[in-house]
Amino acid sequence: MIELEKIKYFKYLLFSSLYFSQGLLMAVGFVLVPLYFVEQGISPAITSIIIGIALLPSIIKFIWGGIVDYFIHLGRKKFIILGVMLLSGSLIIITFIQPSVALIPFTFFLLLSVCGWIFLDVSADAWAIDVSNEENRGKINGSMHAGQYIGMAFGSLFLGFIAKEWGYNISFLIAGLFILLIIVLPLLTKESIKTKKRQKMMPKIIEEFKKKDTKLVSALSTFAFISRGMLIVVIPLFLNIYLKLDVAQVGLIVAIFTISSAIGALICGALTDKWGRKKALYIFFGISLILTLGIIITNTWLIFTIIYALIGFLQGGYLAAVTALYMDTTDPKIGATQFSIYSSFGNFGLTGGQTVSGSLVTLFGFSLTFFLAALMFAPALIVLYFINLKKGNKK
């Protein structure tokens, strides 16, 4: 068995591979499934409802975290393996289900794959908290999110090619088998289980969320990702409607953005360990605000691509820094629960940004929408100012 303490860089490979599998599922769910449904004659309205149903487990992520923490005496690795098996198995099963004929079974197993993803996600986060410290959490989070971005890019390009050449069913099968292979790394890794009995969860959760910094980090989590959510929806529309780019050109620019985000997560994750969380986030948020405003004056695809790639680089950076801050302020005994609560606040901000952005474009146009997306970093910077990391945390 491999001991994480003895092989210095193995933990980065382990956690990046686990997040790579999540990136593959995101490519399947957000790229392949919608296109597959179009091919099957299923309307966009039904498609969005099905994807929304499948994503329901992610909205109550803290419940899955609570389950993992309640059974802390079993360790984190068992739940990671359970998540991988559930995720992989569900994707393999939907290979044999035609949604135009059996939409409900297809939806059920797609939802089951997301359940596996969430189990994998909260368990991997908790394990990372257990085996990391403030000196390397930026690098660990950077490697995790880089793995996720690479998984999304790989899934969109490679699985998209497979779907085009041999059909969507084969692409789902290959995605499931790829994810199943990832189970090898956690199986080979030795886990040190420090708590040998079940624990009472609620008193610890209440105690943690009475703390001022915990409340402020929750607020920061919400504000930090609103702009990101807005850009996810608005950018493809901007490229198609304003810059007159076709689907292939939009896909290429999005791929460049994804690769830039992966690089940013790795480099900026290391920088946040060196500079400290607050200083790094001031820089990442501040420059992101300026660059988002810069989109307003963009009138060519080349200038836009450069600005958008830089925004992606910084998005990867502040994602790594914010999640490192989550870990710094999380009690390891309720690591899965507290981290997933922070993440739920982040998902709320992300989803809120996605939800309102289309309406903002319709009502006010692209320029004002980009201005508002940039402005969303202002409350994040204000909340960050009031976070007073205690001695032992990165400042």
Report each predicted region and the residues it spans.
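Helix-loop boundary and gating motifs at the non-cytosolic
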Residues: 2-58, 215-216, 220, 224-239
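Loop-to-transmembrane helix entry/capping segments in MFS-fold secondary transporters
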Residues: 44-45, 134-143, 247-248, 332-342
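Helix-to-loop junctions at the C-terminal end of transmembrane segments
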Residues: 60-74, 163, 264-276, 361-362
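Structural signature of the two symmetry-related core transmembrane helices
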Residues: 78-93, 279-294
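A late C-terminal transmembrane helix in Major Facilitator Superfamily
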Residues: 333-362
